[in-house]
């Protein structure tokens, strides 16, 4: 091919160039739509005073809201001292603790349940799978009254998972595993049975084949389930606000509502706490992002 022919081949039709420009424009608009709220929240947290309105770039940078969120008192020019209104860092720790334990528990339960559905034959398997998925479709808000009565009664016999306990919140969160069971089951069914059969011929028990053969091959989907469970637990409000009554036991998602008192909206403090709440989610996502795409795509394959 001559140089002129190569140049002609590289020239794109006008319609294709317009389509490409339109795609890039829509992508930039989508990115701006995502970034603008985040930048606005950061700007509110850096403005003096507790105001929700103002420019995207503050005229004056103030760290008072961040100091209060981090548990430090703020000394003003007139000598007055403002103590932290709420234990934000304690709430953040409560959120991380509950989310981590919940995510690990959901991964463990979902994996073992999915293995049974994917590899074992038993009566009523299909009906049980469909029933789990149907019950998962109902929003948690519909079961709040039942959850309160249930954990009130359970707490009389096992106080560590009753009302106003983190154990109770974790126990409630771990009930929503149906969708994760379906996802992991679909991933397991993409893995050839011959690998486990070969391990069985070498003397491995079913548990050893599951633990040493199947689980290492399933790390991508397990990472996806862990991330989704972690995000759901750390951002959940209705169930946590129902079960937790003590201020010091709040999660950050529940405690942040205290800033929005009808008599005094502390927008700056609220914004600083909101940015802090995004740090654990971002950290977990960055640590597990290399497994995320592969796990999501393979987990959706029908076996």
UniProtKB/Swiss-Prot annotation:
Residues 43-95, 151-159, 235-265 are periplasmic. GO terms for molecular function: ABC-type maltose transporter activity. Belongs to the binding-protein-dependent transport system permease family. MalFG subfamily. GO terms for cellular component: plasma membrane. InterPro entries: BP-dep_ABC_trans_perm, MetI-like, MetI-like_sf. One of its GO terms (biological process) is maltodextrin transmembrane transport. It holds the Pfam family BPD_transp_1. NCBIfam families: PRK10998.1 (NF008231). The complex is composed of two ATP-binding proteins (MalK), two transmembrane proteins (MalG and MalF) and a solute-binding protein (MalE). Gene3D superfamilies: MetI-like (1.10.3720.10). The chain crosses the membrane at residues 20-42, 96-118, 131-150, 160-182, 212-234, 266-288. Keywords: Cell inner membrane, Cell membrane, Membrane, Sugar transport, Transmembrane, Transmembrane helix, Transport. PANTHER family: MALTOSE TRANSPORT SYSTEM PERMEASE-RELATED, MALTOSE_MALTODEXTRIN TRANSPORT SYSTEM PERMEASE PROTEIN MALG. This is Maltose/maltodextrin transport system permease protein MalG. Part of the ABC transporter complex MalEFGK involved in maltose/maltodextrin import. Probably responsible for the translocation of the substrate across the membrane. Residues 92-288 form the ABC transmembrane type-1 domain. The keyword Transcription regulation does not apply. Signal peptide: none annotated. It is a multi-pass membrane protein. It comes from Yersinia pestis. Residues 1-19, 119-130, 183-211, 289-303 are cytoplasmic. The keyword Cell inner membrane applies.
